[in-house]
């Protein structure tokens, strides 16, 4: 990594810790003067790493840069799992429909080793865990192939074995989804809301096995 890239990495890591904060508050948290932070933000905005606005926010380019660093670090340290934390949110009920389809159900049984409860647990991730979520996009995972029932074609799903508060399951990432990127879906052999006594807003921890 060149000197400029090392400096950029340090700056973006620091800024990621204060995303969403006004510049004045972010400067205090980072032990910087407002003038110093404004100067840094101006430079990084010009390079496309930080978004315009009154609060600190990385652009997709900035997040992709950090995701690349994370990927290299996890590979170097041979990390076997990552931890995601978020809050339970309600979905639209689509998970129950899709998981109950024979094509998906059978493939999950064959490739993940369990019969899925017909439904998914939706978790909205805390912002600081988004670099880890984006890291999963670049991994192969376990592919649940798409299929057609003669009337409609259903897309492939990438999955990662996982534990939700200790309960075995899998994070599923459909190639077609209505969820924003900060919401993940988890399938399991049991109804996770009941098994773990979860309600909307409850904090959950997901250990994703790589």
Curated annotation (Swiss-Prot):
HAMAP family: Riboflavin_kinase
Cofactor(s) essential for the protein: Mg(2+)
Residues holding CDP: 91-96, 190-193
Alphabetically ordered keywords of this record: Flavoprotein, FMN, Kinase, Magnesium, Metal-binding, Nucleotide-binding, Transferase
Example of a GO biological process term: riboflavin biosynthetic process
Cofactor binding note from Swiss-Prot or TrEMBL: Binds 1 Mg(2+) ion per subunit.
Reaction equations catalysed: riboflavin + CTP = CDP + FMN + H(+)
Pathway noted in the entry: Cofactor biosynthesis; FMN biosynthesis; FMN from riboflavin (CTP route): step 1/1
E.C. numbers: 2.7.1.161
Region (H-T-H motif-like): 1-81
Root EC class: transferase
Residue span of region Riboflavin kinase: 82-210
Pfam family, one: CTP-dep_RFKase
InterPro entries per the UniProt record, alphabetical: RibK_CTP-dep, Riboflavin_kinase_archaeal, Riboflavin_kinase_CTP-dep, Riboflavin_kinase_dom_sf, WH-like_DNA-bd_sf, WH_DNA-bd_sf
Annotated protein name in UniProt: Riboflavin kinase
Signal peptide range: none
Residues that, per the record, bind FMN: 177, 185
Domain of life: Archaea
């Amino acid at each position: 990594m060149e000197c400029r890239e090392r400096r950029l990495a340090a700056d973006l890591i620091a800024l990621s810790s204060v995303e969403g904060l006004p510049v004045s508050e972010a400067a205090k948290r980072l032990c910087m003067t407002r003038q110093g932070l404004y100067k840094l933000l101006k430079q990084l905005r010009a390079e496309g790493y930080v978004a315009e606005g009154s609060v600190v926010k990385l652009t997709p380019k900035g997040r992709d840069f950090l995701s690349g660093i994370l990927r290299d670090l996890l590979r170097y340290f041979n990390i076997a799992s990552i931890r995601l934390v978020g809050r339970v949110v309600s979905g639209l009920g689509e998970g129950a429909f899709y998981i109950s389809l024979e094509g998906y159900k059978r493939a999950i049984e064959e490739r993940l080793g369990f019969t899925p409860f017909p439904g998914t647990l939706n978790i909205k991730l805390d912002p600081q865990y988004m670099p880890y979520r984006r890291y999963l996009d670049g991994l192969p995972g376990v592919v649940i192939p798409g299929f057609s029932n003669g009337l409609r074609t259903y897309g492939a799903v990438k999955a990662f074995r996982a534990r939700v508060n200790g309960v075995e399951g899998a994070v599923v990432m459909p190639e077609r989804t209505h969820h924003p990127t900060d919401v993940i879906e988890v399938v399991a052999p049991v109804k996770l809301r009941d098994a773990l006594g979860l309600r909307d807003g409850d904090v959950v921890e997901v250990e994703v096995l790589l």
